[in-house]
Amino acid sequence: MEEKVTIRLIRNATLRIHYAGKEILVDPMLAGKGTLQSALGVYKTPRVHLTMPMNEIADGLDMVLLTHNHIDHYDPTVKQHLAKNILFLTQPQDKESITQDGFTNVES
């Protein structure tokens, strides 16, 4: 029997995916609505609230997939909400900055 794949949109590019028995968080933007400045400084971001409670986002994760390190894909609050030893998959050019944020299991 095939395992069901689930993809849940949390906000912006942030997704929680269940695939092959693993829980994957993609592009974690976890800051509160309107608490950050947009990349161009034009407006406050994120523009909408998270679609699920933080504990449902962070609990039981197996890994994080960061497509690229822009504020709308990875914000400063991520290091407050995720376990420091979680597997963090990212681009080679972003590995050092993720490690500097305290994450200890970063691969590219």
Predicted regions and their residues:
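A short beta-strand/loop micro-motif in the catalytic core of glycosyltransferases
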Residues: 65, 87-90
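A short helix->loop->beta-strand "cap" motif at the edges of active sites that frequently abuts
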Residues: 22, 84-87, 103-104
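Pre-active-site segment of Zn-dependent metallo-hydrolases
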Residues: 22-65, 76-81
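Active-site beta-strand termini and strand-to-loop segments that position acidic
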Residues: 17-20
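Short gly/ser/thr-rich secondary-structure transition/capping motifs
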Residues: 5-9, 44-51, 69-70
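Active-site environment of divalent metal-dependent phosphoester hydrolases
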Residues: 13, 31-33, 69-74, 95-98
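Metallo-beta-lactamase
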Residues: 2-4, 90-108
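Short active-site oxyanion
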Residues: 4-6, 82-88
